[in-house]
From Swiss-Prot:
GO cellular component: plasma membrane; proton-transporting ATP synthase complex
GO MF, any single term: proton-transporting ATP synthase activity, rotational mechanism
Cellular localisation: Cell membrane
Protein known as: ATP synthase subunit delta
């Protein structure tokens, strides 16, 4: 995994720089997400591994309908370098670079039960205040948390789950 990230990093940075220069973060992000989604399909991955598949055919297979010429050239470079399987990593890194440039923190809130709109808004306000940035929140439900929630915002993890509190209590009692 770390080797894939290392190999993907320069391509993600190049895509980001191009998107920044074009003022087209959203279209590039959407195109990369589409291409990454297509590239991970097992049938497409098998096609991409076939040495008889030409560069132009690979680009046509992975490029969204509404892509620009620059994006096609980017995919062609990936195809020539045999880096098309790295599209999921490139897409993820691109989105991280975009979030940083746009001063947005991406957070995942995993709760024991579905959050109400009011609870989600309160979490967004608290995270916005803590990070002093806009917050893009995705939610997930994990009943094993018993109660509460776990917030994962980049390098920061806030475990307010009952499961986490019980684990910390068990550790404290064991010591």
């Amino acid at each position: 995994m770390s080797q894939a990230l290392t190999l993907a990093r320069p391509y993600a940075r190049a895509a980001f720089a191009t998107a920044r220069d074009e003022g087209a973060f959203a279209p590039w992000s959407d195109a990369l997400a589409f291409s990454a989604h297509v590239a991970v399909d097992p049938r497409v991955a098998a096609l991409l591994a076939n040495p008889e598949l030409g560069r132009d055919d690979a680009v046509a297979l992975l490029a969204p309908v509404s892509h620009g010429e620059t994006y096609s050239r980017f995919l062609a470079i990936l195809a020539e370098s045999h880096r098309l399987p790295l599209l999921p990593e490139i897409s993820g890194m691109f989105d991280a670079l975009r979030a940083e440039a746009e001063h947005v923190v991406k957070a995942t809130v995993t709760s024991a039960a579905e959050l109400s709109a009011g609870e989600l808004d309160a979490i967004k306000v608290a995270l916005r205040k803590r990070f002093n940035r806009e917050v893009d929140v995705t939610t997930a439900v994990d009943a094993s948390l018993i109660g509460g929630a776990v917030i994962d915002a980049g390098d920061v993890v806030i475990d307010g789950s009952l499961k986490g509190k019980l684990a910390r209590l068990q550790t404290a009692l064991a010591n």
